[in-house]
């Protein structure tokens, strides 16, 4: 199952602008002609400079990056947990996401009204947080009597019950579950919204992007969660231009090192607990997505289940060693290519060829 990141935000925060930029930036359309994508799903390539360099060494015909899926979740309003706006539908869509990306408005623009009449990022963040906490409170309050009943017949459920009660206490105090010591594995079946990792995207205008003091204030608002600063309107203009000199000149002019969408894709990938390994050959150079901590056979299974079933060993060289030596042949001669067995835990940037027997 693809892990997705749900994008949420109050009306007029710039969520749709950001999402449209994400969907225009559509690696899937180019590489997977048969993929049908829901209209509210944006699939974004994870930028990785290693791929182009590998493709050069192997003279690969094409390059396929890892991808992250973002899901556009219809606007949240105050009272969503009571069923206001698209309330309940909204909350069930977030439940399906593995992480939540909240777009928060920082830009001031007389022509774009703010739902509360004033631009106040701190208030916006707590409005959404409050709705998610209220929704979780309802879930936990409903679950506790059921868990109490189950625990009477099955002692193993006692730990889940205790964790649910602990979560309830924190939620009543207004604390998201992710910011507590509650064992998230024990409350996983409840699909609590505030147990998901959060990424905050602050939608700024050009001047604000250069204002380090403002950015520090915003970071402090959401720490320890990741904060990303971008101008959604500028990002969608960049995507229109594609990868050309004009786009690079625009970035330079803004004093930004790389597009905000690239940062968002990378942070999203990391927040989902994912990493990549690389395969390369004349046909393609490709980044494959695996959970951090995956073993070599599990990694092989991402290419094809037969690879996992018939796994014998993996021939592995680190990307850095391969680049330093220039070719696979030289890496082998220098003793940098290793044979790893089924207990090997994959490292980020391993360049791999699997040996299997079906």
Predicted regions and their residues:
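Conserved G1/Walker A P-loop phosphate-binding module
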Residues: 1-109
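C-terminal-of-GTPase-core extension/linker across diverse P-loop GTPases
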Residues: 2-8, 13, 19, 146-345, ...
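Short, intrinsically disordered, mixed-charge
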Residues: 24, 56, 92, 130, ...
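Short amphipathic alpha-helical segments
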Residues: 30-31, 112-116, 212-214, 241
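Amphipathic alpha-helical transducer elements in NTP-driven molecular machines
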Residues: 34, 48-51, 64-70, 84-98, ...
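Conserved Switch II/interswitch segment of TRAFAC-class P-loop GTPases
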Residues: 42-47, 74-84, 95-157, 170-181, ...
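Protein kinase-like catalytic core scaffold
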Residues: 69-72, 99-102, 200, 228, ...
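Short, flexible surface segments
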Residues: 96, 347-348
């Amino acid at each position: 199952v693809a892990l997705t990141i749900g994008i949420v935000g109050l009306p007029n925060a710039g969520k749709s602008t950001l999402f449209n930029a994400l969907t225009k930036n559509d690696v899937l359309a180019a590489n997977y002609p048969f993929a049908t994508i829901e209209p509210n799903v944006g699939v974004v390539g994870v930028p990785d400079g290693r791929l182009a360099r590998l493709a050069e060494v192997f003279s690969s015909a094409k390059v396929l990056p890892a991808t992250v899926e973002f899901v556009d979740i219809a606007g949240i309003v105050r009272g969503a947990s009571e069923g206001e706006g698209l309330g309940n539908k909204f909350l069930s869509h977030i439940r399906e996401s593995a992480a939540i990306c909240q777009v928060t408005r920082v830009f001031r623009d007389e022509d774009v009204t703010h739902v509360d009449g004033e631009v106040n990022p701190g208030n916006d963040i707590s409005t959404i947080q409050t709705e998610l906490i209220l929704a979780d409170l309802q879930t936990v309050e409903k679950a506790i009597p059921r868990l109490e009943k189950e625990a009477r017949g099955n002692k193993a459920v006692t730990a889940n019950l205790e964790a649910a009660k602990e979560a309830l206490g924190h939620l009543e105090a207004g604390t998201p579950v992710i910011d507590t010591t509650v064992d998230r594995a024990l409350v996983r079946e409840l699909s609590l919204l505030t147990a998901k990792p959060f990424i905050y995207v602050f939608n700024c205008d050009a001047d604000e992007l250069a204002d380090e003091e403002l950015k520090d204030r915003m970071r402090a608002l959401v720490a320890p969660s990741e904060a990303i600063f971008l101008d959604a309107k500028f990002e969608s203009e960049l995507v229109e231009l594609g990868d050309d000199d004009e786009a690079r000149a625009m970035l330079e002019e803004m004093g930004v090192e790389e597009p905000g969408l690239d940062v968002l894709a990378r942070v999203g990938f990391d927040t989902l607990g994912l990493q990549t390994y690389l395969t390369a050959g004349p046909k393609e150079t490709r980044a494959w997505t695996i959970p951090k901590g995956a073993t070599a056979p599990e990694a092989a299974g991402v290419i094809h289940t037969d690879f996992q079933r018939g796994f014998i060993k993996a021939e592995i060289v680190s990307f850095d060693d391969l680049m330093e030596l220039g070719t696979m042949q030289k890496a082998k001669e220098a003793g940098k290519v290793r044979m790893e067995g089924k207990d090997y835990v994959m490292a980020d940037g391993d360049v791999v060829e699997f040996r299997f027997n079906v």
